[in-house]
Amino acid sequence: MNLPEASSHSVLANAKSLVPRIIPRAEHGISRKNISNGALRVLYRLYEAGFQAFLVGGAVRDLLLGGRPKDFDVATNATPEQTRALFRNCRLIGRRFRLAHVVFGREIVEVATFRGIGEEGDGDRHVVDGRILRDNVYGGIEEDAIRRDFTINALYYDIADFSVRDYVGGIVDLQQRSLRLIGDPEQRYREDPVRMLRAARLSAKLDFAISEEAEAPIRALAPLLADVAPARLFDESLKLFLSGHGLESLRRLHSLDLLGQICPATARALEGPNRERFGRLLGHSFLSTDERVQNDRPVTPAFLFSALLWEPVRSEAERLLGEGYEHANAWSVAVERILHQQATRIAIPKRFAMAMEEIWLLQPRFELRQRKRVMRLLAHPRFRAAYDFLVLRSHEEPELCEQVQWWTEAQGMSAHDLSESLAVPSPARSEDAPAGKRKRPRRRKRKAGSAAGGAETATQIPGE
């Protein structure tokens, strides 16, 4: 990136007096061919209707860094209602921040009106204990720049002349690969504690250093995340863990003492007696997920959260077994308890929580080789996910390698051959087997020419 130096990082107290640094088209690398058609249509229609229209935020940042962003946000002086009047394919969303979503097939372009700097009670602005709960006070572009979180996210690409406007020193921070908050860090984190998670995520994604001023308050203010809605934290966790840089995000969350606020059981397990094995398991699972994301292969939150909470579930099940719980009951109770505890921090949707529960509860069943149990497990709709999780565990638990090999071979066998290989031994070969459990009169009655000596014939599998 070949950009001229900026003169100052200072953010003036009076936003309206800010004078932007303007980088003309010839001095930055943003090309319209790297901007989506939907975003360009929104920008041009707003501009042609007499409004200011800027590409803003992460898209501008990533374009300046030579990336190819997938999501595009637009900032304008048009109100949400004025934006909706220009686009039939537009819907208004949000109470905390009123936004316009313009839909082009599968692409959604988010359009936000410039935010103003208002005091509590001004217009539609509501603040409690420093946290902004609702904010629909509008202003100019200078105020909007001051209101953004990090300097590198406060760069504006002007569709009128294709220049980039920088009000807060974001260009220099891009050059220095520094993540710097706009304004007083403690105040900004109190306004929205999720900004601490964003600091970890962006530093991981971009491989930027968090500035000393921005990092200093994080560990002390991390408990503020307990007041954030669990549903919102689930959305943030997807950005952290399923965007192709999950492993590095996890490391930075842990080092900043943020992991314990969103996944407390995981953080405790990473300090527990099995921390090294559990840490390696998480490393394998997150690295695999990152590779799938980078190769545009599908990923599911259920699998990653299964890994994040595996050691807490396993440890709780072992503790309950030590208290005398029956095996299956110990695992069921452990799963229920850990999921309940996690739900107080991150609201994992039911469809994912159910998948996690099945992945965990199927793990002990891989130890069983009785024919009926094997056939039922192979036919289970969650078998493949549970098997993949078993393979993941085997990287750090060598004693599972034999199980993995056996179940891998079992999947490659026909149902008939697998059933035959698991047939119950005849009485002559297993004298200690209870005779009553060997004889299946009704099955032998239906099957002509069954083997003599009471040996059971192959079980019929649905769809065989």
Please give the residue ranges for each predicted region.
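Catalytic cores of the polymerase beta-like nucleotidyltransferase superfamily
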Residues: 1-464
